[in-house]
């Protein structure tokens, strides 16, 4: 508070970025083995701002039926064709992938929770990533309920299963501090595009420095 103040009173791209914001983004990226990370006020905002900038009417999004409400709402905001499969039903996921390809989808993204919060079930990421490779699809995982304690170093369900996914979203409001904040981690090109087009990022005040500093300390403890 004494060195960085109470709040930023601004969005990130005007005067809402301090060194510690970028430090946290880089630390999260390294922790999750991604190129870069973009911070949001909450993971609900992260999921709400993810799909619309990346997917257009020529693309397809395939979602697990029990995904978190924020994924469902984020998908509603984008123009991609929508497909759904029953919770963890890999046969139906493959059917939907085949249908999306048959319908001429340019890009296909599979969206899933890493851990389904109501039941505690883990997504079958080994099979999801296998099918994604088979049908040339991207994989997005919301890992709010796994980051910080699952996997060899607490990096979540992909680390737990030893697989790689294209995009991860998560929260600073559970194991990584327990207050507020969310993020998207992924390839540099994806994060660069989101910084220009993700509306919750562009039009929401930056995370308070105290939250950022506490999250950095939480990462220290986890690591």
What does each model-found stretch correspond to?
Residues 3-43:
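Conserved N-terminal alpha-helix of the aminotransferase class I/II PLP-enzyme fold
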Residues 83, 87-141:
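Active-site phosphate-binding strand-loop segment of PLP-dependent enzymes
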Residues 108, 135-138, 145, 150-223:
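Active-site C-terminal subdomain of aminotransferase-like
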